[in-house]
């Protein structure tokens, strides 16, 4: 998502691979996977971010998510 990060690509990819394996193990559909990802984001914001900062961080997260989507190729 962000261009620069204090986390290494290896750290992110390792965690992503492990989470993906759990979703695969449970046969999670894309819809269920996205629902779980959304619930994780909501829980992190509600439990680990000051109430005064939640909306701003959620908006930045949403913008980063949208900007990371691949546009379909047109011919």
From Swiss-Prot:
Gene3D superfamilies: YejL-like. InterPro entries: UPF0352, YejL_sf. Pfam families: DUF1414 (PF07208). Belongs to the UPF0352 family. HAMAP family: UPF0352. This is UPF0352 protein VV1_3121. It comes from Vibrio vulnificus (strain CMCP6).
